Amino acid sequence: MKISLVTDAWLPQVNGVVTTLVELGRELRAAGHQVQVIEPGQFRTRSCPGYAGIDLAIAPAKGLADKLDAFQPDAIHLATEGPLGWAGRRYCLRRGLAFTTAFHTKFPEIVNAAIRVPLRLGYAVMRHFHAPSSGVMVPTPSVLEMLRWRGFRNLREWTHGVDTELFAFRETAGDYPGLEEAARPIALFVGRVSYEKNIEAFLRVDLPGTKVVCGVGPVEAQLKERHPHVRWIGLLPRATLAQLYAAADVFVFPSRADTFGLVMAEAMACGTPVAAYPVDGPLTVLARRREEDGSSDARLGGAMHEDLQTACFAALAVPRHEARQRSLDFSWTQAASLFASFLVPAHGRGAPGSSPAVVTQMS
């Protein structure tokens, strides 16, 4: 099948959405699909206000149309709600083409945290964007229910994966250059240093040992000034990041706005247990859904609590092999197969529920 993936999030950006889409493309190609990626690097761009390192395409409509016309995809997926996503939406609607979309990021929460735009308005814009979609892919059951409550339709639960070979298991926390003499336990955060990540909740927690932050972002300078005793690592290549994960005793995920939180699965793959709030992402990554035998919601690979300090101390007691075992539940091969089953034929606007069978015939 020829699949066009339209995304505003792509390399060299460093975030969970980019990692998800890169891994998705790799798995789809390995399964025999032809994948066209339309991303900002193919257009004139400008930096996203307040988010250095994230470039947005300028007036991409014609260039995007030319690329789609030349490729003639069997299925079109709009991965993000940025300029390219909106241009792809217009392209499809004007030509009567079916398409799918994804809800990777809680943009309403991000703009609310940054500039106080009301959540109601933010979700109205998102609902309008996704309304014509034949299938809106969401990463967790709780996000699906939240969007359904907010009036979104055609929702599809789609999970993510983790590269368990790159992020290899360590039975005991290892050393990382510059942290060999750091006091234990080492508590680690990895991610964009921005408003919505709620990093200060982690930095304010009273914990023994050493706190480490890996990432860059718009609030980095002010957090460094307020928390001079924290170790700030900056951006790392993924192979080096795996070494840092493995060196930590606990991975702290303070965000309340992430839809999934891929970094949690990566940390657990290295054997590092996770501490988090019991909110959307962690509830899926750290807890298995109720089984028929009643063994539901077991905390696997970490701990959740509304008191982040309590979660941290509980996570430190989780054996590293349990964290690794939970990470093995997240497979990129399985995620790509599920993604392909949700795609719809671009030239056939049948009921979304019938699309998986059609896609199978086209594969």
What are the residue ranges of the model-derived segments?
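Nucleotide-activated donor-binding/catalytic signature segment of Leloir-type glycosyltransferases, i.e.
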Residues: 220-239
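Short alpha-helical donor nucleotide-sugar binding micro-motif in glycosyltransferases
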Residues: 68, 130, 243-248, 339
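Short hydrophobic beta-strand element within catalytic cores of glycosyltransferases
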Residues: 273-278, 283, 287
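Donor nucleotide-sugar binding/catalytic pocket of nucleotide-sugar-dependent glycosyltransferases
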Residues: 124-178, 182
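Nucleotide-sugar donor phosphate/pyrophosphate-binding loop at the beta->alpha transition
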Residues: 98-100, 109-128
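A charged, aromatic-enriched C-terminal amphipathic alpha-helix characteristic of glycosyltransferases
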Residues: 174, 316-348, 352
